[in-house]
Amino acid sequence: LPPQCVMVGGPLRADRYTAMKSRSIQQSRAVFAFLPSLEGSDEGTVAWRFFASPQDQIDAVLNFTRNLGISSYGVLAPTDTYGQRMTDLFLKAVRTNGSTVKIATYPSGDTTSWGEVMRGFVGGTMRGKTPVPTSTFQAAFIPDSWKNLELLVPFLFYQGEDRLVLMGTSLWEQGLSNRSSVNVANLDLA
C-alpha cells in the first residue's frame, strides 16, 4: 500500500487479517476489519470491527439485565440454525455466572403451535377467567426477527405474562430499519 494510505477497510477473511498482521500493516494504518472477532488484544488497539459479533450481542443484553439486577432468564428460540446458535451462546454466557435458565423452542413457520409453547414457557394457568403466569425468570432472550417478535408477544400476554424484560439480537434492528412506524404498545420492556 502507498504510504499516504492511512486507513484500511477490510479484510473480509480471517486468514487475510493474519497475513496483514504478519506484515505489521496495522502498526502504521488504521484497520477496520469486516470480521466477527479479532486476534488476541488487537481489537481497539491496532484494529477495529465494523459490526457486532453474536457474542457482542449476547454480552450487551446480559450487561443490560445485570445492571437491572436480573439473574434468572428464559430463552424462547426458533428451531432454526440461527436461533439455536444464538441460544447456545446465550446459555454458555449465562451459565458461567451461575444464573438459571428456562428454555423453550418453537418452529418458526408454524404459528399454530406457539400458544402451547408459550403456556409451557411461562407456566400459564387460569384463575377463573384470568391467565396467571408462574414463570420464575425475569427476562426472556428471543433470538428471532422483529416480525416474529410482534407475533410472539401477544401469545405471552394471552398467558398473562407482561412482566418480562425482552432481549433480542441485531435481527430486531434489521426488522425495524425499513419501518416508518412501530406499534410499541406491547413492547414496553423490549
Question: Where do the protein language model's features map onto the residues?
Answer:
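Short, well-structured alpha-helical segments in soluble
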Residues: 1-6, 64, 116-135
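Hydrophobic alpha-helical
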Residues: 14-20, 133-158
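Extracellular/periplasmic periplasmic-binding protein-like sensory domains
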Residues: 44, 50, 107, 114-116, ...
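Short, well-ordered amphipathic alpha-helices
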Residues: 87-91, 118-125, 151-155
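Short hydrophobic segments within beta-strands
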Residues: 75-76, 142-143, 169
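Short loop/turn motifs at secondary-structure junctions
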Residues: 3-4, 69, 136, 186
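Glycine-/small-residue-rich active-site loops that bind phosphorylated ligands and cofactors
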Residues: 81-82, 109, 147
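Extracytoplasmic ligand/sensor domains, especially the bilobed periplasmic-binding protein
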Residues: 5-104, 165, 176
